């Protein structure tokens, strides 16, 4: 899957980490904290975006040209 993620500066990344840590210290689960901060970033971000491809989708992206031939099963 290709997606455009907000391009964050080092300082913005640090602020996000600190916000996640703060939410976790207040009792929120890590998954909830990450999701909340990610949503806040997506909602408020006005800068550029970075195109990314997730590893699990690499096979779909590569198409059939790069697959190894399947070996026949022994009977």
UniProtKB/Swiss-Prot annotation:
Family: Belongs to the UPF0181 family.
Record InterPro entries: UPF0181
Pfam families documented for this protein: UPF0181
Organism: Erwinia tasmaniensis (strain DSM 17950 / CFBP 7177 / CIP 109463 / NCPPB 4357 / Et1/99)
Disulfide bonding pattern of the chain: none
The protein's name in its UniProt record: UPF0181 protein ETA_15280
């Amino acid at each position: 899957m290709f997606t455009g993620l907000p391009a964050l500066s080092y300082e913005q990344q640090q602020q996000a980490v600190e916000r996640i840590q703060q939410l976790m210290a207040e009792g929120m689960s890590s998954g909830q904290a990450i999701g909340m901060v990610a949503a806040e970033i997506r909602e408020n971000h006005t800068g550029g975006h970075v195109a990314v491809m997730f590893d699990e989708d690499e096979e779909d992206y590569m198409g059939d040209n790069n697959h190894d031939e399947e070996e026949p099963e022994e009977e």
